[in-house]
Amino acid sequence: MEALESVKLIKGIEQKYDVISIKWKGISVWPFLRLYIKDSVTSQRENKASASNIGLVLRCLFAYNPFRALKRHDIWSFTACDRRKRIGDKMVHRISGAFAAQGVNCLMIEKPLKGFGHYSRKEIEEQDIISESWLLMTFHAMEVFSRLITPKIENEDLLKKILADNNLQFNYLRYVRMLNAQRRAMRLLLLLNPKPKVVMIECPYDVMGYQCAFHEKGINVVEMQHGSLNGNHFSYNAREYEPKMNPDCVCVFGEEEYKYLTEEKPQYAPYVKMTGMYMLERADQYFSNDIFKEERKKYDSIIVISGQPAWEIPLSKFVDSIASGHDNILFVYIPRHQREDIVFNSDNVRLIHGVNIYEYLKWADIHITITSTTSLEAQYFHTPTIFYDYQNLATNYFKDFFKEENGVSFINSAQQFDYAFNKIYGHNLAYQEIFAHDHVKRLMDVVSEYIK
């Protein structure tokens, strides 16, 4: 089943059945289960604790000093290693980087990058940081040992009926145990260490069990937007939410996300604040020299492509087919992660890993992607975007968000490239002001409300 079909399926279920009444320990578990039901029918998420994942977790336990957690911190910040971007000789967090830069009393808890782990201490700015591997190991162990116990689900017959009516094979008991294991692992961490005054989480829908534990202990949770946040993102289009598994406040990039959460989904979180994005402001200040100065002597224009893990192969093939007929254009392909299966036959395509995408976006003439939020960030740098509308994903995500005068074009074949290129290249365009400015001040104002 395609991703968009699965979204339609889940929305249909939520309209037909009283899904919020399916509870465990008085907590509605549907908002958690819906994520994994969708993934089970689209095979987008690897949920098994594979040998490689276990090895990574064990290897990362002492990547940073775990005893840093014993110190009292005002803030715990949950993020992931793959959200770091290079600024000079440091790998800086694109969303949460302001905490280290401002010297805030913050403990960063970082998820390791699959196949890599963490960057060394000398490559990062954070002083107080630990690997989330300790929590990952603990809650997976707890989930394994809890398999002898069957969770008691309120309205379990309704859940069984939903699965049967829609011909879905889904081990919901396993995921309820996973939710509880996350909750218990976090309760243990809170028991062993001084409690923070507030918790900042970049991807809260993956750790709803953590949020349960924080709310049980009276600790506020603030989400920091890290990617798309609109009605087309599956985590933000549920009909109803469980407050104990959702943030108390959301820091969003700008006005569009603010309007969506306050007007269309006010049930997602009680408070919404516009704070912009840290990395954009820092990158704009730092990357002041044209990275393509020498390439412009050979090529008429430079196009940067933002890869996405789920669609690297179709996107790279699409780019290669365009590049073969445009020797005067340099195509710079930047995948999200290191991959060996991305291959180009055209000499005017460069595959580059491990760079700061924002430096390349700033100096590119045009940007190409499928649904990456780099299309939003490209607006900040006044770089137009051509969307490859693979499986109608781009139009479903962004067609209603952008107008043509914003410097965007949607195409579904290489043959349409020239038309799109000529429509947006070298013209005066009305770019959107998607990101709020003065990020650091705005973020510190939000944090100060919780750490008085």
Predicted regions and their residues:
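Catalytic-core helical/loop segments in enzymes performing group transfer/polymerization on anionic/lipid-linked
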Residues: 1-452
